[in-house]
């Protein structure tokens, strides 16, 4: 019985060797792999894989920026960022739908 248990443990250990670089899928287009954030197969330069999270359809947020379809949305202050609902978000006094500012 002890030999069977040791074989199972050894098999589980060996099965995990080489799988340390697991890809993390965020929605249908974003992913995190080997310390980089990707949109499709393109690296999002400057995106933080530790804080990246999908917040809506093709919208990704990290600790510094918001991205829509892999493009950084300009003039966004993450400190004042607030998600309102699916694909709607607020930054300071501006409300956005995806990457478009909604005019008053």
Regions found by a protein language model. Give the residues of each.
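Sec-dependent signal peptide recognition
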Residues: 2-11
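Non-catalytic tandem-repeat scaffold regions and their flanking low-complexity/translocation tails
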Residues: 19-104
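Hydrophobic h-region of N-terminal signal peptides that target proteins for export
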Residues: 11-20
